[in-house]
Design a protein with these regions (language model features):
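Acidic/charged, solvent-exposed loop-and-adjacent secondary-structure segments enriched in E/D, K/R, S/T
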Residues: 48-81
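Extracytoplasmic
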Residues: 21, 35, 91-93, 107-109, ...
Length: 223
């Protein structure tokens, strides 16, 4: 984890990404007393985020809890997750709209707009490699317009806030006949005047296990 804007800090550690059906777990532990962990779990119905300190959650956890569709739609983790919605788009009752092509890391990708069945404040875009159709990126965006103040002077002082979460997937290799990414990056940014924030997490995945039973309690991560 690296704080690129809005502070200073960097940490290394171990991480686990697990899924079973629509349930998803993202668990990371860092060698930092100030930020020792990030633990997010979706039990198929509710999203949980464990505080990294009493009463304190990270900006990423706060954003995801405010936008649970990231997990309930099976989007987080991409093809690393058994909940990935493109495995059963009709069952999810979601829609995809083609939005042209875009270059990512020098490669042409197909850009798709993802529209959940239930309304969401997020704009969600999925990117597939145009040559091999690997899922290489998902972007989530939300813009909050500046509120109107009680007076013109107060209105001028208000500022728009823009949130953006980018998942990037790379280093595709075969695991148990499946082609899966072995590097997973999360980048979360908040754009606001005089107080920007940019956080970066990179997961280097070294071991894959399949058909391993996981108890429901493991996905309830708020404690």
């Amino acid at each position: 984890m690296i704080i690129r804007t809005g502070g200073r800090g960097q940490g290394n550690g171990a991480a686990l990404i697990a899924s079973q059906g629509f349930r998803v777990l993202v668990n990371a532990e860092f060698d930092s007393a100030a930020y020792p962990l990030e633990k997010l779990g979706f039990d198929g119905k509710q999203l949980y985020a464990r505080p990294y300190a009493p009463g304190a959650r990270s900006p990423l956890a706060g954003f995801l809890l405010s936008h649970p569709a990231t997990f309930s739609e099976g989007l987080i983790g991409g093809t690393l997750s058994s909940a990935w919605p493109l495995l059963d788009l009709s069952g999810r009752r979601a829609k995809l709209e083609y939005s042209g092509t875009e270059k990512i890391a020098g490669r042409r990708t197909y850009k798709l707009k993802y529209i959940p069945h239930e309304s969401s404040d997020l704009k969600i875009k999925i990117f597939l490699d145009a040559e091999n159709f690997h899922h290489v990126r998902t972007e989530y965006e939300r813009n909050i317009a500046a509120p109107i103040g009680a007076t013109p002077a107060q209105s001028i002082s208000q500022r728009e806030i823009r949130y953006k979460l980018i998942e990037t997937f790379s280093d595709f290799r075969t695991e148990a006949s499946l082609t899966l990414p072995h590097t997973y990056n999360l980048q979360f940014s908040v754009f606001r005047l005089n107080d920007p924030l940019l956080l970066d997490w990179t997961f280097n995945l070294t071991r894959f296990t399949f058909d391993y039973p996981i108890e429901l309690k493991e996905f309830v991560t708020d404690r």
